[in-house]
């Protein structure tokens, strides 16, 4: 048995690392990744266009944490499907020669000295499908089906849904009332894209209220806009009307750790809404298939 550790990609002529040297190498690697997260957090809140680009990345990579989305945005923002070298190999997919790996954080469970469970994070090297000879999924069509999205969003709403002729803001097609725990949708709005945008944003308010100990529509307004933007982006609905052209001073002035916490709340609410919508759309698709078979 040896106490020597060899780097994953060590060449035949490279010296082995001692246990201490290997640990130091991994510590430095992790430190570099955390610095990359902090730098990306500062960068996106300094420029609305960069913030929007980050939201585009997070909307595609909805299963990844905000911290990992920041890492992906910083290294390979156009990513759509990530796997490590071994997992691509299991699918008989080869990495393109010269492709640069993307560093993300992978949670690892461990047992503390007192016997309680804990979670630490290791740096994991992954590659996007575009860095391989694998097939890339087709891009989402613009305005794919806003009416279907509206129906699914209302069907899976975590709060009551009610139709109304008037809303507090005339230019809105939907409004979440936290006191009544109800999502109101305006009748006879002909523009299905506008309705989809409003419903997605107001669902963001509803989900943020559910996920938070306290709720303020004013304080959470920008987060709800971001959620609506990401949901519409994910389902191919136009996003130009979402007001992400100005970063709130309260967010821009925060420290990187605080920015990441806000992004995490936004990402978690978006991912929860998307999960319910996706499940509902799949269920309806299955029903249509059964009807067709009959």
Language-model region placement:
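N-terminal accessory/interface modules of nucleic-acid-binding and processing proteins
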Residues: 1-294
């Amino acid at each position: 048995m040896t106490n020597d550790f060899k780097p994953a990609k060590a060449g035949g002529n490279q010296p082995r690392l001692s246990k201490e040297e290997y640990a130091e190498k991994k510590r430095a690697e992790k430190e570099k990744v955390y610095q990359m997260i902090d730098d990306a957090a500062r960068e996106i809140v300094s420029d609305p266009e960069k913030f929007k680009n980050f939201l585009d990345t997070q909307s595609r990579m909805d299963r990844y944490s905000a911290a990992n989305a920041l890492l992906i945005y910083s290294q390979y923002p156009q990513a759509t499907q990530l796997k490590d070298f071994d997992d691509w190999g299991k699918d008989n997919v080869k990495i393109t020669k010269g492709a640069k790996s993307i560093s993300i954080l992978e949670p690892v469970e461990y047992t503390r000295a007192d016997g309680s469970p804990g979670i630490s994070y290791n740096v994991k090297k992954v590659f996007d499908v575009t860095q391989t000879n694998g097939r890339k999924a087709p891009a989402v069509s613009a305005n794919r089906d806003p009416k279907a999205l509206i129906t699914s969003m209302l069907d899976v709403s975590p709060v009551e849904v009610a139709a109304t002729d008037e809303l507090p803001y005339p230019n809105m097609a939907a409004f979440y009332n936290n006191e009544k725990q109800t999502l109101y949708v305006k009748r006879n709005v002909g523009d299905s894209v506008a309705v989809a945008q409003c419903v997605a944003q107001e669902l963001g308010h509803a989900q943020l209220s559910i996920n938070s100990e306290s709720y303020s529509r004013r304080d959470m307004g920008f987060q709800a806009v971001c959620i609506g933007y990401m949901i519409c982006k994910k389902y191919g609905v136009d996003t130009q009307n979402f007001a992400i052209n100005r970063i709130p001073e309260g967010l821009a002035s925060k420290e990187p750790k605080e920015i990441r916490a806000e992004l995490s709340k936004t990402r978690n609410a978006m991912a929860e809404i998307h999960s319910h919508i996706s499940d509902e759309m799949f269920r309806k698709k299955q029903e249509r298939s059964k009807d067709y078979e009959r």
